[in-house]
Amino acid sequence: MTKQVGKKFAWVIKNFSSLQCKKFYSVPFQIGDCKWRLSIYPKGNNCDYLSLFLEVADFKSLPSGWRRYVKLRLYIVKQLSTLIRKTHRWFDQEMWGWGFLYMLPLTKLHDEKEGFLVNGELMIVAEVDALGFIDPLNESEESEDPTQPLKKIKLNDDGAVSSDLLEEASPRKESMEVNGFQVLPSQVESVRLIFERHPDIASEFRAKNQYLRKACMDFLLSLVETLCQSLQEFSNEDLVEADIALTYLKDAGFKVDWLEKKLDQVRDKKEKERSCLAKLQETEETLLKLKQKCTELDALMDTEKAELSAIRTPLSFEDVV
């Protein structure tokens, strides 16, 4: 069962635990000028994790040299909360599918206490924001697909799906050059700030091809944006992907020692967060035990007060004679 509302696509897989196939596909759905589909490995893709990917369903029919830059959010909805994974990727004729190999441990997925499977059903929501594409006939332009009035799905605390009307339109945008890199107008200030603070960042970057130069700059901006996430949103997978992105940028010739230090700081803060969460959980458990003990002591005091009151009751005349 599927439902699409604007940029979000909801996919409910019934009898999920009964699936025997290695790979399972959703029906195609249209966002922008591409048809997309989700693919899932119910038993993991050679790992003990649920694997989930977004693919361009009609990539064979697209013109040679096509590219799409996509902001992707994948949600696995559970009863009380939602698992979210986010990434930013270029989709092209060589790499027309991206996703998460380690989306969710299978043991956690099938644990009834976790609440991912409800009556045997698994609900997945994909938010696909196709930001733009590079026209192979005109590399100086960067355009974005116009969006029509749409409804945006919101996930409630109980995992239900509701719809709010949201109208927005994105006009066609020209790319702009900043320090030799073609960027979108929305990226200009960020790129300028990077070069102001780190003027030699691209001094050893030798690529001349504008596609490659833009892809690398998008990679850099995505990495910075990733590091700006709150620690609560920052997952172990984000750390791994950030390391990969940093290595890619260094290999390409970018001087990103400053960014590596920031990543180390985030990694340290994430470790401290885990430690604090563990201590907090331990304190909460201790407090719960103390509260339980207080409740038991209150009940004991009430019993002893009643007993004392009974003992103090004076004898009546009839009791005495």
Swiss-Prot record:
**SMART domains in UniProt:** MATH (SM00061)
InterPro entries in the cross-refs: MATH-CC_domain_protein, MATH/TRAF_dom, TRAF-like
Residue ranges of every copy of the MATH domain listed in the record? 6-128
As recorded in UniProt, coiled-coil segments are: 255-310
**Which keywords annotate this record?**
Coiled coil
Q: Which PANTHER family match?
A: MEPRIN AND TRAF-LIKE DOMAIN-CONTAINING PROTEIN-RELATED, TRAF-LIKE SUPERFAMILY PROTEIN
Could you tell me what this protein is called?
MATH domain and coiled-coil domain-containing protein At3g58410
Please name the taxonomic classification of the source.
Eukaryota, Viridiplantae, Streptophyta, Embryophyta, Tracheophyta
